[in-house]
Structure formats: C-alpha cells, structure tokens
Curated annotation (Swiss-Prot):
Keyword flag Nucleus: no
Chain residues that bind dCTP: 115-120, 133, 141-143, 162, 175, 184
Family per record: Belongs to the dCTP deaminase family.
Reactions this protein catalyses: dCTP + 2 H2O = dUMP + NH4(+) + diphosphate
One BP annotation, GO: dUMP biosynthetic process
Top-tier EC class: hydrolase
Name of the protein in its database record: dCTP deaminase, dUMP-forming
C-alpha cells in the first residue's frame, strides 16, 4: 500500500523511517522530496574501451586534490562540489548521490522517481534503478543522463527526486541481511555488478 502524507509523517516521527537531514516541507501528498548531494562520479572518456560486467571493479590508482576537490580513480573521476553548480553536458551520464541519508524498516519498500520539473529540462535522474528494498540504508545513488541538447546546471541541495513509500508484510530477510551490495553506500557509488559473477 502506497503511504500518504499523514502515514509518512507518523513513521518519521516514530523513527521507523529515518531521513536525515529532514524537514516536514519535504513531505508531499504521497511522497517525500529528496535533494541532490554534492558528490558526482564521471566516466573517464577515452580511457575505457569496453565495460565488462564480470570485471567492473573500480580500483583506485591515484588521488589528486586541489581547490575543486577532484579525486581521480581508474574508471571514474570523482567530483565534490560545494556551492558552484555541476554542469552535465548533452549526452553525458554521471552518477550522483542524494543529500539525505535514508533508512527503511523491513516492512517498507520504496520507489524513486525524478521530479517533473527536472524531467521537463530533459534530465533523467535514474536510468533504470528506482526500486529500494526493505532494510536499505545509505545515500541513494542516482544515474543521471542529460537527454537535452544543451548543458544543465545542477546545484547541491536542489530538489531532484521523489521517494514513494510502500507498506508491505515484513520480509523474511531485508536488504542488509541479504548482503545488499549498496548497503550503507556513501556518495555516488559505482556498479558492483562483478559480484553477481562470483
């Protein structure tokens, strides 16, 4: 059953659902607004010939920091922004994180959707992974794609997504207990699909 605003508020007040930081203004009639974090992960163009899901580990090879706080990795470049916008160019794909930390109980599942105002700019905020299992905990990763023919500026803490919450019968084993790959993820987290081949 999809939760309404009253039920969402009640579960947050009881600390059954944890969203931090949180303001009651984020509660919509049947969802919660979520904001964009400040961590982005970008594929390093020209350095990857092909992606092999069996061997997609993101091995750290070097770290460089300057005033823009850029950290270099093998397959990605990590960018942490503070006040300036992050610009996503036409046809670009980036991983980003949600600002809020989320924790769901074993009887709540969730679905993540882009906000309509964001979609009308030509921005897809999750290319396919919108489902969140009961027991999830962490900062959700967004898979952002610019379908527009012009660049789009993204600002830290701007409203970017809506989280719908569904009450279900309590699961036998939740996301944590099943060893979910992205349990307690922080920042924009790379694919760990290679673990499916072990």
């Amino acid at each position: 059953m999809l939760l309404n605003d009253r039920e969402i508020k009640e579960l947050i007040d009881k600390k059954e659902i944890i969203i931090e930081p949180f303001s009651y203004e984020q509660i919509q009639p049947a969802s919660i607004d979520l904001r964009l974090g400040n961590r982005f992960r970008i594929f390093r163009k020209g350095e990857i010939e092909v992606i092999d899901p069996k061997d997609f580990k993101d091995e750290l090879i070097k770290i460089e920091q300057d005033e823009n706080k850029i950290i270099e990795k093998y397959k990605y470049t990590d960018v942490i922004i503070t006040e300036n916008p992050f610009i996503i160019y036409p046809g670009d794909f980036v991983l980003a994180s949600i600002y809020e930390y989320i924790k769901l109980p074993r009887y709540i599942a969730a679905q993540l959707h882009g906000k309509s105002s964001i979609a009308r700019l030509g921005l897809i905020i999750h290319t396919s992974a919108g489902w969140i299992d009961p027991g999830y905990e962490g900062h959700l990763t967004l898979e952002i794609f610019n379908t527009n023919n012009v660049p789009i500026k993204l600002y830290p803490k701007m409203k970017i997504a809506q989280l719908q919450l569904f009450r279900i019968n309590p699961v036998e084993r939740d996301y944590k207990e099943k060893g979910g790959k992205y349990y307690k993820e922080k920042g924009a987290t790379s694919s760990e699909i290679w673990k499916d081949f072990i």
